[in-house]
Amino acid sequence: MKLFVGLGNPGAKYAGNRHNIGFMALDQIASDHGFSPWKSKFQAQMSEGTLSGEKVILLKPQTFMNNSGQSVGEALRFFKLTPADVVVFHDELDLAPSKCRVKNGGGHAGHNGLRSIHAHIGADYGRVRLGVGHPGHKDAVAGYVLRDFPKADQGWLDDLMRGLSDGAAALATGDSGRFMNAVALRVAPPRSSTGEASKGRKKAQKSEPGVAKTPAKAATPEAPAAGDIPAAPEDSRSPMQKLLDKFK
């Protein structure tokens, strides 16, 4: 059994915040993989399902971020799990938006949700770090993570959520490499080799050294047909006038 924990703050006010990206990830997994309806348990919203034959509990603590460990500790003890069975999805300031990294154990890096989990179950649990970027100064962090993702971020955010869901089964079986591949295929899909080769060929044709372009020949105007040559105007002078004109 695995316990997937998504970090965030409860309530509609916070639903679209950067700090709630962990909740968003679990919502996507639950929706895509037919998990049970969410119910209240362990001071959290909980859903159950199966991924690649592995039973998985999804947990969204409703204690607010700074007390997330209370909920995680309760669930861990109830299901008789170890910290190694836990994977926490959380926002990561030190990763650029759309980036994702898997980590096992280590410090909390000042993240209050992780700090609380450390206090209740120790540090030996897995994390899926979801990049949201950094505002540039530590004094701006609180306001930054408690603001909604802007509309401009919705494209990569949707791709990231789908990638996390695609790879969830691999994560449940401990295959972090396959999980990361699934995420990468959504966030940075491979380009068409045919399209790239075609572009390359066109570029080469445009700039191939040593090949002089032959200028196009100017079109030679066609000679008019015999019937098209205008006839000389008729001479209307009298014979006497013609004779006089010769001596002018």
Curated annotation (Swiss-Prot):
It is found in: Cytoplasm. The record marks 91 as: Stabilizes the basic form of H active site to accept a proton. PROSITE patterns: PEPT_TRNA_HYDROL_1, PEPT_TRNA_HYDROL_2. Residues 190-248 are annotated as: Disordered. Signal peptide: none annotated. The active site is at 19 (proton acceptor). It is an enzyme of class 3 (hydrolase). It comes from the Bacteria. Its EC number is 3.1.1.29. Belongs to the PTH family. HAMAP family: Pept_tRNA_hydro_bact. NCBIfam families: pth. This is Peptidyl-tRNA hydrolase. The gene is pth.
